[in-house]
Amino acid sequence: MVSLLRLCSFLLAAGSILVQGSPIIAPSIPPCEPPSNFTGPSNFTSRPGNGASPFWLIAHRVLTKDGVKAALGHGANALEMDITGWWSGWFGDHDGLLTSAGDTVSDLFDEIASRRTQGDPVSFVWLDLKNPDFNKNGVNIVSLMILCREKLEKVGVRVLYGFYSSQTNGPSFKFVKQVMNENEAIGIDGKFETVEKDFEEKGIPLQKRVFSSGLFNPDFNFGNCEVHSSGVCAQLREGKESHEFSKVFGWTVSSYTRKDHVYKMMEVGVDGLIYGFVASHYYDHADIRHTLSTIRGWLEEHKDTHRLATVDDNPWSSMSKKGSSKSSWVKGEVPSIAH
């Protein structure tokens, strides 16, 4: 275990993890010493609610500042953002095309932080990492994590680093695993058995494990919730019943999704649903408001057992004997980085 300063020195002087043939080296700006207000524990609370299970309304594909405003205005308490690295920086970008980028991640985070300090109950930001191992011109996983900690976490917004099963052997996954702090978690999207095995083999503490399963339209492969199958509903049910994850999220609920399928996903116990458009960035629209009314309708019918999560609910908390996730990097202690 080494201090933050020693870690940064190590990365700057000799440390590297190979990303597309080039090393990730901690950038010299901002400096390695964290600012005095980097991530204060006072910004994070985890008080119990009324006994009902907290539920997260996760806005889908929030790629612009206007999308942030719309989602929070609709009552979302978490935001899913597709993140793509370009030579000029990290962007809200799902497709990675010359014309597909939204606003910069820096600007998006500034908008989220501003709304959070004004009282909007955004609990966490889910970063759907499209090319996590990108490493060009100082744009890499290190620079992204610094943005998260300086702009989001210091105002009480937690972060979920979202990977796909095909990305878990990459250097960025290993880096996040080694330096994530108490406000961060790792999500893996894929098949239940594959994801469970990945988390177990890589030694991720249970409270830091988030499993997600879904489809751009889950109706296309919804399946039978009660049997073992590759269908979306069965995958989510197995994830919840396994007790191997801190949280289980489903995706993507839209105005096209069958209402009974939305309800069944909630009945098997998912902790939240990604909702929004199937193939477009988030903005204010009647279809999105209709989708929200469907989800809220179920929550209202089950208000004795479920409630909307608040900023006082820590999504990355779970009692586990599988190990703990000690605060690292921000607090000054991190594991050594394997090359």
UniProtKB/Swiss-Prot annotation:
Its cofactor is Mg(2+). GO terms for cellular component: extracellular region. It is found in: Secreted. Mg(2+) binds at E80, D82, D128. Residues 313-339 are annotated as: Disordered. It comes from the Eukaryota. GO terms for biological process: lipid catabolic process. One of its GO terms (molecular function) is sphingomyelin phosphodiesterase D activity. Binds 1 Mg(2+) ion per subunit. The active site is at H60. Residues 1-21 form the signal peptide. Its main location: secreted. Its EC number is 3.1.4.41. A motif (SMD-tail) lies at residues 309-316. It catalyses: a sphingomyelin + H2O = an N-acylsphing-4-enine 1-phosphate + choline + H(+). InterPro entries: PLC-like_Pdiesterase_TIM-brl. Residues 317-328 have a biased composition (Low complexity). Keywords: Hydrolase, Lipid degradation, Lipid metabolism, Magnesium, Metal-binding, Secreted, Signal, Virulence. Transmembrane segments: none annotated. Belongs to the sphingomyelinase D/phospholipase D family. The SMD-tail motif is highly conserved and may be responsible for structural stabilization. This is Sphingomyelinase D. It comes from Arthroderma benhamiae (strain ATCC MYA-4681 / CBS 112371).
